[in-house]
Amino acid sequence: MKGIGTDIIEIERIELAVSRSGQQFLDRVFTAAEQEHCQGKVHSLAGRFAAKEAVLKALGTGLREMRWTNIEILPNHLGKPEVTLSGPALERAEKEGIHRILVSIAHDRGRAVAFAVAVGKEKEG
């Protein structure tokens, strides 16, 4: 394990950001594929936002030179969220020897919570 991160957010905060800034907020934080997957469902957007924050913490950095869209979180064929990094986020992961990042997302009582674990390559032998 190379790092861990967690985040919790009130779903209402994301709802407010969407109502205030609309598409500008969505485009700044979420990839086109994430937006298509969430279909405007605020709880899904909030879960992904929390997951991106958790991933940043697992990487051991804040946004700094990264963009929110350098971290993409989409479900695999079984519905499990999977992280895809690009640009500076991918460079940071490679520099730290991070092979993949596992995430878990949950929603309850008006909040979304996410947990991320950065995993290094398994040792052979």
UniProtKB/Swiss-Prot annotation:
Compartment annotation: Cytoplasm
Domain of life: Bacteria
GO function terms (MF aspect): holo-[acyl-carrier-protein] synthase activity; magnesium ion binding
GO biological process terms held by the UniProt record: fatty acid biosynthetic process
Name listed for the protein in its UniProt record: Holo-[acyl-carrier-protein] synthase
GO CC aspect terms: cytoplasm
Main enzyme class: transferase
Family: Belongs to the P-Pant transferase superfamily. AcpS family.
Keywords per UniProt: Cytoplasm, Fatty acid biosynthesis, Fatty acid metabolism, Lipid biosynthesis, Lipid metabolism, Magnesium, Metal-binding, Transferase
Function: Transfers the 4'-phosphopantetheine moiety from coenzyme A to a Ser of acyl-carrier-protein.
Main localization, broad class: cytoplasm
EC identifiers of the protein: 2.7.8.7
Family annotation (InterPro entries): 4-PPantetheinyl_Trfase_dom (IPR008278), 4-PPantetheinyl_Trfase_dom_sf (IPR037143), ACPS (IPR002582), Ppantetheine-prot_Trfase_dom (IPR004568)
Encoding gene (name): acpS
Chemical reaction(s) catalysed: apo-[ACP] + CoA = holo-[ACP] + adenosine 3',5'-bisphosphate + H(+)
Transmembrane segments: none
Cofactors: Mg(2+)
Origin species: Desulforamulus reducens (strain ATCC BAA-1160 / DSM 100696 / MI-1)
Sites where the protein binds Mg(2+): 7, 53
